[in-house]
Protein backbone atom coordinates (compact mmCIF):
# COMPACT_ATOMS: atom_id res chain seq x y z
CA UNK A 1 0.00 0.00 0.00
CA UNK A 2 1.93 3.02 -1.24
CA UNK A 3 1.23 6.27 -3.03
CA UNK A 4 2.87 6.53 -6.41
CA UNK A 5 2.59 10.28 -7.01
CA UNK A 6 3.41 13.15 -4.72
CA UNK A 7 0.40 15.38 -4.01
CA UNK A 8 0.73 19.04 -4.97
CA UNK A 9 0.59 20.64 -1.52
CA UNK A 10 1.52 24.34 -1.62
CA UNK A 11 1.59 25.21 2.09
CA UNK A 12 5.05 24.07 3.11
CA UNK A 13 7.50 26.72 4.29
CA UNK A 14 4.90 29.51 4.42
CA UNK A 15 4.45 31.47 7.65
CA UNK A 16 0.95 32.85 8.27
CA UNK A 17 0.73 36.50 7.22
CA UNK A 18 -0.82 37.43 10.55
CA UNK A 19 2.52 36.67 12.21
CA UNK A 20 3.77 40.18 11.41
CA UNK A 21 1.22 41.67 13.79
CA UNK A 22 1.56 39.11 16.53
CA UNK A 23 3.85 40.99 18.94
CA UNK A 24 7.43 40.64 20.09
CA UNK A 25 7.07 37.43 22.10
CA UNK A 26 5.21 35.55 19.39
CA UNK A 27 7.65 36.79 16.77
CA UNK A 28 10.66 35.60 18.75
CA UNK A 29 9.03 32.21 19.25
CA UNK A 30 8.33 31.92 15.53
CA UNK A 31 11.89 32.91 14.64
CA UNK A 32 13.22 30.26 17.01
CA UNK A 33 10.88 27.72 15.45
CA UNK A 34 12.01 28.73 11.95
CA UNK A 35 15.64 28.29 12.95
CA UNK A 36 14.79 24.83 14.26
CA UNK A 37 12.91 23.97 11.09
CA UNK A 38 15.74 25.19 8.86
CA UNK A 39 18.10 22.97 10.84
CA UNK A 40 15.93 19.99 9.91
CA UNK A 41 17.62 18.52 6.89
CA UNK A 42 16.27 16.11 4.29
CA UNK A 43 15.30 12.62 5.42
CA UNK A 44 18.21 10.22 5.61
CA UNK A 45 15.84 7.43 4.59
CA UNK A 46 12.88 8.21 2.34
CA UNK A 47 11.33 4.80 1.70
CA UNK A 48 9.83 3.46 4.89
CA UNK A 49 7.79 0.47 5.99
CA UNK A 50 5.66 1.11 9.09
CA UNK A 51 3.63 -1.51 10.94
CA UNK A 52 0.30 -1.49 12.73
CA UNK A 53 -2.33 -3.74 14.30
CA UNK A 54 -5.91 -3.60 13.02
CA UNK A 55 -7.35 -1.24 15.62
CA UNK A 56 -9.02 2.14 15.23
CA UNK A 57 -6.23 3.86 17.13
CA UNK A 58 -3.84 3.22 14.24
CA UNK A 59 -5.76 6.10 12.62
CA UNK A 60 -2.92 8.69 12.71
CA UNK A 61 -0.86 6.43 10.45
CA UNK A 62 -3.72 5.89 8.00
CA UNK A 63 -4.61 9.58 7.87
CA UNK A 64 -0.98 10.71 7.50
CA UNK A 65 -0.76 8.35 4.53
CA UNK A 66 -4.13 9.08 2.92
CA UNK A 67 -3.86 12.88 3.27
CA UNK A 68 -0.34 13.03 1.85
CA UNK A 69 1.25 14.25 5.08
CA UNK A 70 4.07 11.72 4.83
CA UNK A 71 4.82 12.74 1.27
CA UNK A 72 4.85 16.41 2.30
CA UNK A 73 7.90 15.38 4.36
CA UNK A 74 9.49 13.58 1.39
CA UNK A 75 8.70 10.24 2.99
CA UNK A 76 7.33 7.41 0.88
CA UNK A 77 5.63 5.05 3.25
CA UNK A 78 4.27 1.53 3.03
CA UNK A 79 1.82 0.69 5.83
CA UNK A 80 1.65 -2.98 6.71
CA UNK A 81 -0.74 -4.76 9.08
CA UNK A 82 0.94 -7.20 11.48
CA UNK A 83 -0.42 -10.48 12.83
CA UNK A 84 0.08 -9.65 16.51
CA UNK A 85 2.02 -7.41 18.87
CA UNK A 86 4.97 -9.79 19.29
CA UNK A 87 5.50 -10.11 15.55
CA UNK A 88 5.24 -6.34 15.21
CA UNK A 89 7.86 -5.68 17.89
CA UNK A 90 10.24 -8.35 16.60
CA UNK A 91 10.04 -6.91 13.07
CA UNK A 92 10.86 -3.42 14.33
CA UNK A 93 13.82 -4.77 16.30
CA UNK A 94 15.25 -6.75 13.39
CA UNK A 95 14.76 -3.88 10.94
CA UNK A 96 12.02 -5.34 8.76
CA UNK A 97 9.88 -2.40 9.93
CA UNK A 98 11.27 1.10 10.37
CA UNK A 99 8.72 1.92 13.05
CA UNK A 100 5.27 0.97 14.24
CA UNK A 101 2.05 1.66 16.10
CA UNK A 102 2.93 0.14 19.49
CA UNK A 103 1.48 -0.60 22.87
CA UNK A 104 2.80 2.08 25.22
CA UNK A 105 4.42 -0.61 27.37
CA UNK A 106 6.36 -2.18 24.50
CA UNK A 107 9.23 0.32 24.16
CA UNK A 108 9.64 0.37 27.95
CA UNK A 109 9.55 -3.41 28.37
CA UNK A 110 11.96 -3.97 25.48
CA UNK A 111 14.38 -1.41 26.88
CA UNK A 112 14.43 -2.92 30.39
CA UNK A 113 14.55 -6.48 29.05
CA UNK A 114 11.12 -7.87 29.91
CA UNK A 115 10.59 -10.07 26.86
CA UNK A 116 12.69 -9.35 23.78
CA UNK A 117 15.41 -6.89 24.80
CA UNK A 118 16.28 -3.93 22.58
CA UNK A 119 16.45 -0.16 23.05
CA UNK A 120 13.19 1.25 21.66
CA UNK A 121 12.20 4.92 21.83
CA UNK A 122 8.98 6.83 21.31
CA UNK A 123 8.69 10.48 20.31
CA UNK A 124 4.89 10.47 20.03
CA UNK A 125 1.82 9.27 21.88
CA UNK A 126 -0.78 8.19 19.33
CA UNK A 127 -3.93 8.54 21.42
CA UNK A 128 -5.70 8.63 24.77
CA UNK A 129 -8.41 6.20 25.89
CA UNK A 130 -9.91 3.84 23.30
CA UNK A 131 -10.29 0.53 25.19
CA UNK A 132 -13.07 -1.23 27.05
CA UNK A 133 -13.74 -4.39 29.05
CA UNK A 134 -16.37 -6.76 27.66
CA UNK A 135 -17.95 -9.82 29.28
CA UNK A 136 -20.04 -12.59 27.78
CA UNK A 137 -23.81 -12.40 27.90
CA UNK A 138 -23.89 -15.20 30.49
CA UNK A 139 -21.47 -13.38 32.78
CA UNK A 140 -23.35 -10.11 32.33
CA UNK A 141 -26.62 -11.71 33.41
CA UNK A 142 -24.90 -12.84 36.62
CA UNK A 143 -23.35 -9.39 37.16
CA UNK A 144 -26.54 -7.39 36.65
CA UNK A 145 -28.11 -8.02 40.08
CA UNK A 146 -25.00 -6.46 41.64
CA UNK A 147 -24.95 -3.35 39.41
CA UNK A 148 -26.69 -0.17 40.68
CA UNK A 149 -29.48 1.11 38.42
CA UNK A 150 -30.41 4.61 37.31
CA UNK A 151 -33.98 5.90 37.55
CA UNK A 152 -34.71 4.70 34.01
CA UNK A 153 -33.57 1.17 34.88
CA UNK A 154 -30.34 1.27 32.91
CA UNK A 155 -27.06 0.33 34.63
CA UNK A 156 -25.23 3.10 36.43
CA UNK A 157 -21.75 3.70 35.07
CA UNK A 158 -18.92 3.22 35.78
CA UNK A 159 -19.50 -0.43 36.61
CA UNK A 160 -16.92 -1.59 39.13
CA UNK A 161 -15.40 -5.06 39.36
CA UNK A 162 -17.21 -5.40 42.70
CA UNK A 163 -20.14 -6.58 40.55
CA UNK A 164 -17.94 -9.23 38.93
CA UNK A 165 -16.52 -10.56 42.19
CA UNK A 166 -19.61 -12.69 43.12
CA UNK A 167 -19.53 -14.20 39.62
CA UNK A 168 -15.85 -15.14 39.96
CA UNK A 169 -16.56 -16.61 43.39
CA UNK A 170 -19.41 -18.71 41.96
CA UNK A 171 -17.07 -20.05 39.29
CA UNK A 172 -14.52 -20.91 41.96
CA UNK A 173 -17.16 -22.67 44.07
CA UNK A 174 -18.08 -24.76 41.03
CA UNK A 175 -14.41 -25.64 40.46
CA UNK A 176 -14.18 -23.61 37.25
CA UNK A 177 -11.53 -20.99 36.44
CA UNK A 178 -12.73 -17.54 35.39
CA UNK A 179 -10.75 -16.57 32.29
CA UNK A 180 -10.30 -13.25 30.53
CA UNK A 181 -8.31 -12.17 27.50
CA UNK A 182 -5.96 -9.25 26.98
CA UNK A 183 -3.81 -8.46 23.99
CA UNK A 184 -0.21 -8.65 25.31
CA UNK A 185 1.57 -8.90 28.66
CA UNK A 186 2.82 -5.28 28.48
CA UNK A 187 -0.32 -3.85 26.92
CA UNK A 188 -2.37 -1.05 28.39
CA UNK A 189 -5.23 -3.54 28.21
CA UNK A 190 -3.45 -5.92 30.59
CA UNK A 191 -2.71 -3.16 33.09
CA UNK A 192 -6.19 -1.61 32.82
CA UNK A 193 -7.89 -4.97 33.25
CA UNK A 194 -5.68 -5.77 36.22
CA UNK A 195 -6.30 -2.32 37.70
CA UNK A 196 -10.08 -2.71 37.40
CA UNK A 197 -10.08 -6.24 38.83
CA UNK A 198 -7.83 -5.31 41.77
CA UNK A 199 -9.96 -2.25 42.53
CA UNK A 200 -12.85 -4.70 42.98
CA UNK A 201 -10.88 -6.98 45.29
CA UNK A 202 -9.91 -9.57 42.65
CA UNK A 203 -6.25 -10.56 42.31
CA UNK A 204 -5.32 -10.79 38.61
CA UNK A 205 -2.12 -12.70 39.39
CA UNK A 206 1.62 -12.08 39.34
CA UNK A 207 4.51 -12.61 36.96
CA UNK A 208 7.84 -14.02 38.14
CA UNK A 209 10.30 -13.70 35.24
CA UNK A 210 13.23 -14.42 37.59
CA UNK A 211 11.64 -17.85 38.09
CA UNK A 212 10.89 -18.26 34.37
CA UNK A 213 7.17 -17.74 35.05
CA UNK A 214 5.79 -15.32 32.48
CA UNK A 215 2.15 -16.43 32.55
CA UNK A 216 1.11 -13.80 35.09
CA UNK A 217 -1.24 -16.17 36.91
CA UNK A 218 0.46 -16.69 40.30
CA UNK A 219 -2.15 -16.35 43.09
CA UNK A 220 -4.74 -15.27 40.51
CA UNK A 221 -8.48 -15.10 41.15
CA UNK A 222 -8.97 -14.41 37.43
CA UNK A 223 -6.77 -16.10 34.82
CA UNK A 224 -5.59 -13.67 32.14
CA UNK A 225 -4.16 -14.82 28.81
CA UNK A 226 -3.14 -13.29 25.49
CA UNK A 227 -5.49 -13.19 22.52
CA UNK A 228 -4.88 -11.04 19.39
CA UNK A 229 -7.42 -8.18 19.19
CA UNK A 230 -9.38 -9.28 16.08
CA UNK A 231 -9.83 -12.77 17.59
CA UNK A 232 -11.33 -11.58 20.88
CA UNK A 233 -15.05 -11.84 19.99
CA UNK A 234 -14.75 -15.31 18.45
CA UNK A 235 -12.60 -16.57 21.34
CA UNK A 236 -15.22 -15.41 23.83
CA UNK A 237 -18.08 -16.78 21.73
CA UNK A 238 -16.39 -20.20 21.75
CA UNK A 239 -16.27 -20.18 25.56
CA UNK A 240 -12.48 -20.15 25.76
CA UNK A 241 -12.61 -16.87 27.70
CA UNK A 242 -15.40 -15.25 29.72
CA UNK A 243 -14.49 -11.67 28.88
CA UNK A 244 -11.70 -9.47 27.61
CA UNK A 245 -10.09 -6.06 27.48
CA UNK A 246 -9.34 -4.75 23.99
CA UNK A 247 -9.37 -1.66 21.81
CA UNK A 248 -11.99 -0.84 19.23
CA UNK A 249 -13.73 -1.99 17.19
CA UNK A 250 -13.63 -5.35 18.98
CA UNK A 251 -15.82 -4.41 21.95
CA UNK A 252 -18.51 -2.94 19.72
CA UNK A 253 -18.18 -6.01 17.51
CA UNK A 254 -19.35 -8.15 20.45
CA UNK A 255 -22.43 -5.94 20.79
CA UNK A 256 -23.19 -6.12 17.07
CA UNK A 257 -22.77 -9.91 17.16
CA UNK A 258 -25.01 -10.14 20.22
CA UNK A 259 -22.46 -12.18 22.19
CA UNK A 260 -21.29 -9.79 24.90
CA UNK A 261 -21.62 -6.53 26.80
CA UNK A 262 -18.90 -3.91 27.31
CA UNK A 263 -19.17 -3.05 31.01
CA UNK A 264 -16.62 -0.23 31.31
CA UNK A 265 -14.40 1.93 29.11
CA UNK A 266 -10.82 2.67 30.07
CA UNK A 267 -11.73 6.37 30.29
CA UNK A 268 -13.87 5.33 33.29
CA UNK A 269 -10.93 3.43 34.82
CA UNK A 270 -8.39 6.24 34.30
CA UNK A 271 -9.62 9.39 32.50
CA UNK A 272 -7.47 10.39 29.53
CA UNK A 273 -5.07 7.50 29.95
CA UNK A 274 -2.27 7.17 27.38
CA UNK A 275 -2.81 4.27 25.02
CA UNK A 276 -0.63 3.64 21.93
CA UNK A 277 2.70 5.20 20.95
CA UNK A 278 4.80 5.30 17.81
CA UNK A 279 7.96 3.28 18.36
CA UNK A 280 11.33 3.02 16.60
CA UNK A 281 14.63 1.50 17.61
CA UNK A 282 17.10 3.88 19.22
CA UNK A 283 19.56 2.83 16.51
CA UNK A 284 17.15 3.88 13.74
CA UNK A 285 16.62 7.29 15.33
CA UNK A 286 20.35 7.80 15.81
CA UNK A 287 21.05 6.92 12.18
CA UNK A 288 18.03 8.78 10.77
CA UNK A 289 17.21 11.74 13.04
CA UNK A 290 15.66 13.90 10.30
CA UNK A 291 13.53 11.01 9.11
CA UNK A 292 12.30 10.39 12.66
CA UNK A 293 11.30 14.02 13.15
CA UNK A 294 9.56 14.12 9.77
CA UNK A 295 7.53 11.01 10.65
CA UNK A 296 6.40 12.78 13.82
CA UNK A 297 5.49 15.91 11.83
CA UNK A 298 3.22 13.94 9.51
CA UNK A 299 1.56 12.09 12.37
CA UNK A 300 0.98 15.28 14.36
CA UNK A 301 -0.89 16.75 11.41
CA UNK A 302 -2.95 13.57 11.16
CA UNK A 303 -3.73 13.59 14.88
CA UNK A 304 -4.93 17.18 14.71
CA UNK A 305 -7.04 16.41 11.64
CA UNK A 306 -8.75 13.58 13.52
CA UNK A 307 -9.79 15.83 16.43
CA UNK A 308 -10.27 19.24 14.88
CA UNK A 309 -13.63 21.04 14.78
CA UNK A 310 -15.15 18.76 17.43
CA UNK A 311 -14.32 15.56 15.56
CA UNK A 312 -15.86 16.82 12.31
CA UNK A 313 -13.55 14.58 10.27
CA UNK A 314 -14.35 11.37 12.12
CA UNK A 315 -17.01 10.20 9.63
CA UNK A 316 -14.45 10.37 6.84
CA UNK A 317 -11.91 8.66 9.08
CA UNK A 318 -14.36 5.82 9.72
CA UNK A 319 -14.73 5.22 5.98
CA UNK A 320 -10.95 5.11 5.60
CA UNK A 321 -10.41 2.80 8.57
CA UNK A 322 -13.11 0.38 7.41
CA UNK A 323 -11.05 -0.54 4.35
CA UNK A 324 -9.62 -4.07 4.52
CA UNK A 325 -6.02 -2.84 4.37
CA UNK A 326 -6.56 -0.87 7.60
CA UNK A 327 -9.01 -2.14 10.25
CA UNK A 328 -11.35 -3.98 7.91
CA UNK A 329 -14.46 -3.84 10.10
CA UNK A 330 -17.93 -2.59 9.18
CA UNK A 331 -18.28 1.18 9.14
CA UNK A 332 -21.15 0.99 11.63
CA UNK A 333 -19.01 -0.94 14.11
CA UNK A 334 -16.12 1.52 13.88
CA UNK A 335 -18.43 4.54 14.01
CA UNK A 336 -20.07 3.24 17.18
CA UNK A 337 -17.06 4.44 19.18
CA UNK A 338 -15.16 6.77 16.84
CA UNK A 339 -17.94 9.32 16.41
CA UNK A 340 -18.66 10.22 20.03
CA UNK A 341 -20.94 7.46 21.28
CA UNK A 342 -20.43 4.05 22.85
CA UNK A 343 -22.90 1.17 23.07
CA UNK A 344 -22.83 -0.91 26.25
CA UNK A 345 -25.81 -3.30 26.38
CA UNK A 346 -27.45 -3.59 22.99
CA UNK A 347 -29.59 -0.50 22.60
CA UNK A 348 -27.89 1.35 25.48
CA UNK A 349 -25.82 3.84 23.49
CA UNK A 350 -24.40 6.76 25.45
CA UNK A 351 -22.48 9.90 24.62
CA UNK A 352 -18.75 9.34 25.12
CA UNK A 353 -17.19 12.21 23.13
CA UNK A 354 -13.66 11.46 24.32
CA UNK A 355 -13.65 7.70 23.82
CA UNK A 356 -10.87 8.28 21.27
CA UNK A 357 -8.62 11.32 21.66
CA UNK A 358 -5.78 11.84 19.22
CA UNK A 359 -4.65 15.44 19.67
CA UNK A 360 -6.59 17.57 22.14
CA UNK A 361 -5.54 17.56 25.81
CA UNK A 362 -1.93 17.32 24.53
CA UNK A 363 -2.70 13.69 23.69
CA UNK A 364 0.27 13.36 21.35
CA UNK A 365 2.95 14.59 23.78
CA UNK A 366 5.26 11.85 25.17
CA UNK A 367 4.99 12.59 28.90
CA UNK A 368 7.58 11.02 31.18
CA UNK A 369 4.82 10.56 33.78
CA UNK A 370 2.98 8.27 31.35
CA UNK A 371 6.08 6.11 31.05
CA UNK A 372 6.51 6.01 34.82
CA UNK A 373 2.90 4.83 35.28
CA UNK A 374 3.49 1.85 32.99
CA UNK A 375 6.68 1.00 34.83
CA UNK A 376 4.84 1.10 38.18
CA UNK A 377 2.33 -1.42 36.85
CA UNK A 378 5.12 -3.67 35.63
CA UNK A 379 6.52 -3.57 39.16
CA UNK A 380 3.10 -4.00 40.77
CA UNK A 381 2.42 -7.26 38.93
CA UNK A 382 5.94 -8.70 39.08
CA UNK A 383 7.18 -8.06 35.55
CA UNK A 384 9.83 -5.98 37.31
CA UNK A 385 10.74 -8.53 39.97
CA UNK A 386 12.87 -6.45 42.32
CA UNK A 387 12.44 -3.03 43.96
CA UNK A 388 13.55 0.03 42.00
CA UNK A 389 14.38 3.53 43.19
CA UNK A 390 12.39 6.57 42.13
CA UNK A 391 15.47 7.70 40.21
CA UNK A 392 15.46 4.45 38.22
CA UNK A 393 11.87 5.10 37.10
CA UNK A 394 12.78 8.63 36.01
CA UNK A 395 15.94 7.60 34.18
CA UNK A 396 14.18 4.77 32.34
CA UNK A 397 11.33 7.05 31.28
CA UNK A 398 13.78 9.61 29.92
CA UNK A 399 15.72 6.94 28.06
CA UNK A 400 12.62 5.78 26.18
CA UNK A 401 10.34 8.82 25.85
CA UNK A 402 11.79 11.49 23.52
CA UNK A 403 10.00 14.85 23.84
CA UNK A 404 13.07 16.47 22.26
CA UNK A 405 12.12 14.90 18.92
CA UNK A 406 8.50 15.89 19.43
CA UNK A 407 9.55 19.50 20.04
CA UNK A 408 11.65 19.60 16.87
CA UNK A 409 8.68 18.32 14.87
CA UNK A 410 6.27 20.78 16.46
CA UNK A 411 8.57 23.77 15.93
CA UNK A 412 9.08 22.77 12.31
CA UNK A 413 5.31 22.60 11.77
CA UNK A 414 4.91 26.03 13.35
CA UNK A 415 7.62 27.43 11.09
CA UNK A 416 5.95 25.81 8.07
CA UNK A 417 2.74 27.65 8.97
CA UNK A 418 0.89 24.36 9.27
CA UNK A 419 0.23 24.51 13.01
CA UNK A 420 0.22 27.09 15.80
CA UNK A 421 2.29 27.34 18.97
CA UNK A 422 -1.00 27.12 20.88
CA UNK A 423 -1.48 23.59 19.52
CA UNK A 424 1.35 22.35 21.73
CA UNK A 425 2.55 22.50 25.32
CA UNK A 426 4.76 25.44 26.29
CA UNK A 427 8.09 23.79 25.58
CA UNK A 428 10.02 26.28 27.70
CA UNK A 429 8.13 25.34 30.86
CA UNK A 430 7.03 21.75 30.16
CA UNK A 431 8.68 19.29 32.57
CA UNK A 432 7.25 16.11 31.08
CA UNK A 433 5.34 15.33 34.27
CA UNK A 434 1.60 15.93 34.41
CA UNK A 435 0.11 17.38 37.60
CA UNK A 436 -1.18 14.77 40.05
CA UNK A 437 -3.83 12.78 38.17
CA UNK A 438 -7.18 11.99 39.75
CA UNK A 439 -10.38 10.21 38.79
CA UNK A 440 -9.09 6.63 38.90
CA UNK A 441 -11.79 4.05 39.56
CA UNK A 442 -10.29 3.16 42.95
CA UNK A 443 -9.91 6.77 44.07
CA UNK A 444 -6.11 6.56 44.25
CA UNK A 445 -4.29 9.61 42.85
CA UNK A 446 -1.15 9.32 40.74
CA UNK A 447 1.91 11.56 41.06
CA UNK A 448 4.47 10.51 38.46
CA UNK A 449 7.34 12.03 40.42
CA UNK A 450 6.76 9.64 43.36
CA UNK A 451 6.37 6.14 41.87
CA UNK A 452 7.19 4.14 45.00
CA UNK A 453 4.83 6.20 47.15
CA UNK A 454 2.16 5.55 44.52
CA UNK A 455 2.70 1.79 44.68
CA UNK A 456 2.43 1.84 48.48
CA UNK A 457 -1.23 2.87 48.19
CA UNK A 458 -2.38 -0.42 46.62
CA UNK A 459 -3.67 -3.25 48.80
CA UNK A 460 -3.17 -5.79 45.99
CA UNK A 461 0.21 -5.80 44.24
CA UNK A 462 3.95 -5.83 44.87
CA UNK A 463 5.50 -2.78 46.50
CA UNK A 464 8.47 -1.77 48.62
CA UNK A 465 10.90 -4.66 49.07
CA UNK A 466 8.27 -7.34 48.38
CA UNK A 467 9.32 -10.04 45.92
CA UNK A 468 7.89 -13.39 44.90
Predicted regions and their residues:
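Short, glycine-/small- and polar/acidic-enriched structural segments
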Residues: 38-219, 223-225, 237-238, 242-255, ...
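Sec/Tat signal peptide C-region and signal peptidase I cleavage site
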Residues: 33-37
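Secondary-structure end/capping motifs
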Residues: 287-404
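Bacterial N-terminal signal peptides
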Residues: 20-31
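Conserved C-terminal helix/tail region of periplasmic/extracytoplasmic solute-binding proteins
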Residues: 372-468
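Short glycine- and hydrophobic/aromatic-rich loop-to-beta-strand nucleating segment
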Residues: 133-134, 277-280, 284-285
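N-terminal export leaders
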Residues: 9-21
Amino acid sequence: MRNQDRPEHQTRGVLPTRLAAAGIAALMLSLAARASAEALGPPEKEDLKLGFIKLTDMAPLAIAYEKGFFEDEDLFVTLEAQANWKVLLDRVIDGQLDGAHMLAGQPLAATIGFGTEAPIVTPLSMDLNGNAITVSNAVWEQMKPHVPKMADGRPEHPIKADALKPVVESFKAAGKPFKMGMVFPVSTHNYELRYWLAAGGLNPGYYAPHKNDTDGQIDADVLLSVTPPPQMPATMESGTIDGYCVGEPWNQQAVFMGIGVPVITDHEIWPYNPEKVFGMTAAFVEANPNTAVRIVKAMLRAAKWLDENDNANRAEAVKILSRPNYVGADEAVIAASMTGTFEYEKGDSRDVPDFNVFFRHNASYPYYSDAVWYLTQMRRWGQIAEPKSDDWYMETAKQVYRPDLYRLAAESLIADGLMEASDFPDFDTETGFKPTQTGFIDGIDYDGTRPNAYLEQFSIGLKGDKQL
